[in-house]
């Protein structure tokens, strides 16, 4: 395989359509605006080209029932308690269920995962022993979570099998599962390195793939080694397939790289990129000395009302030490970081998700995509160095438009500079946390 980097990417047409959505304007505009006109233009183009992807449901569908999904999917959606699609689901699902390629940037917690899970399940006609759907993501925990979403929405589709593959586990077990027609999956969720290894060793046949999804695509494609892995996997799939890419952040530099994998994609950008802050999330900072962090953290955990909290630190050592300190101070906590064994990480993630513990101390391994609905408080014990990573971190609280609270400790000149960059990048004012505290109703759901 060539190592020429970007030049080695497959050249696909990037004659894309684009939908820019500003949430406030979309709310005012109701059922008019750029989304409708762009969709009409796409319908005309497809008609002229003899597109076989089917007719579209109106892009401003207001309920999941308007998407005309399979009865099995509709039942599962009702069981999950979902009634109305989020903004990103409303604008994407009507076309994605018919096989249109998608490039989607939307803030954390707006239901991007459900877009590709529902779209691929809607199109899936399972054939024993054939992989029809491939989903690639950058983190093992995220792969595990996506697999769980597939299980949740396919509960009334008993013939559909889903498997998750990631590094750190014996590849022989994956090979055994794939070889057996009784266990061979129709849907594969995987990290790039492990899936590439399965392809190279011919343990997996991707010649029947109809849907190719990359979640957190900016993170997957910005690292050259990971991008090369994806290219090798991509080449093992048919040329005629649907490709969908999703992320909360998509820089101008990464977009052309994404587009090379796509054919005439629908581009959805929910809210202007500079305003990717989370609706319903209260954001504050606390200025303090490094030595004051532990005392202030204990005070916050005592004073604030929360269901679950995630506390971000900058290193594995600090994660372990802070967790020990919290447990010794009668704050039962669990820690998750990248240096523990894979089985242990998954077990701890599951324990936290199942509400066995209310406090989790983590490095950035939990900073992207991980969706635990009870988290309504995120604390940056150590502030991140990157503005985009701040968004992913605080996005763990206030998922899918719910309320939440994010507090960042600022203890150095570097932290102050990062805070200024965050406010400039996302066009948001982050206030100093009031000494008297804040009203719980501003960050707690009724």
Curated annotation (Swiss-Prot):
Cited PANTHER family: ATP-DEPENDENT RNA HELICASE DBP3
Region Disordered, annotated ranges: 23-52
Domain Helicase ATP-binding, first and last residues per copy: 93-268
Residues with the Phosphoserine modification: 13, 37
Function of the molecule: ATP-binding RNA helicase involved in transcription elongation and required for the export of mRNA out of the nucleus. SUB2 also plays a role in pre-mRNA splicing and spliceosome assembly. May be involved in rDNA and telomeric silencing, and maintenance of genome integrity.
Low complexity composition bias: residue spans: 23-49
A GO term from the CC aspect: spliceosomal complex
Keyword Transcription regulation: no
SUBUNIT field: Component of the TREX complex composed of at least SUB2, TEX1, YRA1 and the four THO complex components: HPR1, MFT1, THO2 and THP1. Interacts with HPR1, YRA1, and YRA2. SUB2 may mediate the interaction between the THO complex and YRA1. Associates with growing mRNP complexes during transcription. This association requires the presence of HPR1. Also interacts with SAC3.
Q motif (motif): residue ranges: 62-90
UniProt enzyme class: hydrolase
Name of the encoding gene: SUB2
MF terms in GO: ATP binding; ATP hydrolysis activity; RNA binding; RNA helicase activity
Primary location: nucleus
Residues that bear N-acetylserine: 2
Keywords: Acetylation, ATP-binding, Helicase, Hydrolase, mRNA processing, mRNA splicing, mRNA transport, Nucleotide-binding, Nucleus, Phosphoprotein, RNA-binding, Spliceosome, Transport
Highest classification ranks of the organism: Eukaryota, Fungi, Dikarya, Ascomycota, Saccharomycotina
Classification via InterPro entries: DEAD/DEAH_box_helicase_dom, Helicase_ATP-bd, Helicase_C-like, P-loop_NTPase, RNA_helicase_DEAD_Q_motif
Coiled-coil spans in chain: none
This protein's record includes keyword Metal-binding: no
Reaction catalysis annotation: ATP + H2O = ADP + phosphate + H(+)
Annotated compartments: Nucleus
PROSITE patterns referenced in this protein's UniProt entry, alphabetically: HELICASE_ATP_BIND_1 (PS51192), HELICASE_CTER (PS51194), Q_MOTIF (PS51195)
Protein family: Belongs to the DEAD box helicase family. DECD subfamily.
Motif (DECD box): 215-218
Organism of origin: Saccharomyces cerevisiae (strain YJM789) (Baker's yeast)
Protein name: ATP-dependent RNA helicase SUB2
């Amino acid at each position: 395989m060539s190592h020429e980097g970007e030049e080695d990417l497959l050249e696909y047409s990037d004659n894309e359509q684009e939908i820019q959505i500003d949430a406030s304007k979309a709310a005012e505009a109701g059922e008019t605006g750029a989304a409708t006109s762009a969709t009409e233009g796409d319908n005309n183009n497809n008609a002229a080209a003899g597109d076989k992807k089917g007719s579209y449901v109106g892009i401003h569908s207001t309920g999941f029932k308007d998407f005309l999904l399979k009865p099995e999917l509709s039942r599962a959606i009702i069981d999950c308690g979902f009634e109305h699609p989020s903004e990103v689901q409303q604008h994407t699902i009507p076309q994605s269920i018919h096989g249109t390629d998608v490039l989607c940037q939307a803030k954390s917690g707006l239901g991007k995962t459900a877009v590709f899970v529902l779209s691929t399940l809607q199109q899936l006609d399972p054939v024993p022993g054939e992989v029809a759907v491939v989903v690639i993501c950058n983190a093992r925990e995220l792969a595990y979570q996506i697999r769980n979403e597939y299980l949740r929405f396919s509960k009334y589709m008993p013939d559909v099998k889903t498997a998750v593959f990631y590094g750190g586990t014996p590849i022989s077990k994956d090979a055994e599962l794939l070889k057996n027609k009784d266990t061979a999956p129709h849907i594969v969720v995987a990290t790039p390195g492990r899936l590439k290894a399965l392809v190279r060793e011919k343990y997996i046949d991707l010649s029947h793939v109809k849907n190719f999804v990359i979640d957190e695509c900016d993170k997957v494609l910005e690292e050259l080694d990971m991008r090369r892995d994806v290219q090798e996997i991509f080449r093992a799939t048919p040329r005629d397939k649907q490709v969908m890419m999703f992320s909360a952040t998509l820089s101008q530099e990464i977009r052309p790289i994404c587009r090379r994998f796509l054919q005439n994609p629908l581009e959805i950008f929910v809210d202007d990129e500079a305003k990717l802050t989370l609706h319903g999330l209260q954001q504050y900072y606390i200025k303090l000395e490094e030595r004051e962090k532990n005392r202030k953290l204990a005070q916050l955990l005592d004073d604030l009302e929360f269901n679950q909290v995630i506390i971000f630190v900058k290193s594995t050592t600090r994660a372990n030490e802070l967790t020990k300190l919290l447990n010794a101070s009668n704050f039962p906590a669990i820690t998750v970081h990248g240096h523990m064994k894979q089985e242990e990480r998954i077990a701890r993630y599951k324990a936290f998700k199942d509400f066995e513990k209310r406090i989790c101390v983590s490095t950035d391994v939990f900073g992207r995509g991980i969706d635990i609905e009870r988290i309504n408080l995120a604390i940056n014990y150590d502030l991140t160095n990157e503005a985009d990573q701040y968004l992913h971190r605080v996005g763990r609280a206030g998922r899918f438009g719910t309320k939440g609270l994010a507090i960042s400790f600022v203890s150095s000149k570097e932290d102050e500079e990062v805070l200024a960059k965050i406010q400039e990048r996302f066009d948001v004012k982050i206030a100093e946390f009031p000494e008297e505290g804040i009203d719980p109703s501003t960050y707690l759901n009724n």
